UniProtKB/Swiss-Prot annotation:
Species per Swiss-Prot/TrEMBL record: Banna virus
Pfam family, one: Seadorna_VP6
Gene that specifies this protein: Segment-6
Protein name: Non-structural protein 2
Keyword Coiled coil tagged: yes
Coiled-coil features, chain-numbered ranges: 29-64
Domain of life: Viruses
Keyword terms, alphabetized: Coiled coil
Amino acid sequence: MMIALIQMKNMKCTLKVEETTENQELEGVSFDELVALREENAKLKQENEALKAKLHRLESDWTTSDIVEKVELMDAQFDRIGKIMDKMREPMLFKRDEIELHGDLLARVEGLLRIKNERSEIEFEKDIQCIVGRCFSDENKQRNLEKMIKSFEYDDIADTIALRLTHFIQDPGLRSIVYAMCKAAVLNQNYLNIEVQEIVDVTRQKYTHNARDDIDFYPMFTFDANVPEGVFDHIYKKHYLSPQSAALVHTLSHLDVNVDGNGIAMYHIGSATRFAECSVVYVDGRAYKPIRVMAEYAIFPTLPHEYKGRVEGLLLLHGGLAPITLVRVYHDVNVGGLVTGSIAASVSTLLRNCMLYSFDIYFTPNGVCINAVGNNNFVNIIDINCCGRAFGKAPLDQGSWNRNKFMGHKHGRGSKCKQYKKINS
């Protein structure tokens, strides 16, 4: 490259030309080679610009891709939040007569229903206009809303509350409990007014025996020739059974003939529960009476709506309702004697044809299994006669019973016996 230096001296212009280092380096290079180098340099510049443009596009694409990914993630989050909100609003939605009540409108309708019985017809009409008047711009819809509110019954409040509280509950037994408790709370009364004939009681047909000759009881029976020492049972006067076993056998023999091995089940009711054989458990609209109560366990007809091994019910007490959870119990044993037919017929046939030394019942996932040990040789097969002794027939002479009870005490005027004074006071 040529650099021109202009010096001003004595008003004369002197031009001095110096050669740069580049020019010195290009000495000996031909013109054609110089042109080729310039073309190559231009080509490299173009490639460099193309690479810069491509890099810019890639960076732009990466930025766009990142933005798109973030937007898609936000859309997914918004969609998920929307579904959650919709699910949260579902229990608040009450549909009737093609009208959807939710949120504020549902609260207003509930408030109206709470005062409905306290207001006259004219006053209630004014209340409706004041609280929900002009709620819908559609006149037909508004008219149907007002008509619906007037037709509501008082306990529809309980229905609505129960519908909300049980919306996400999968256990039908628990849903029935919430429904009943809502009814009781809103109406301030026990709405479970159950008639006696409606109670599921599989022991109702007492004094009816179903011993049959066509029943094969041997799968449930083990022969033992050795007669144990002791006395006969207090019910049948024939078997060497403990009082508890005799009472259980007696109960099973009086079950409804249609109850088979899958028709009864054992449940754990808890040791703190005041429970007896006269108690009634309400499960999803029906009342059930226990067959047998043994401490913290109870035998029931197989209860409906079992959910994960549990049945939710309501224990009917004199003072109202008490929720109760009955846990299904299975014996972890590998035994035979599965009862495939009528339990009452099988047990009654055993009692009639055998002299029993022991009697065990097991509750398995396949049904009830019975294991009895005894002797069926030289046994008098007689008709079963149990209930007179089973329920403890009292002596005819009540006076002699009292005298025998306090035998050895000096009773009469001047007696210091506290028991005698208590009876005669």
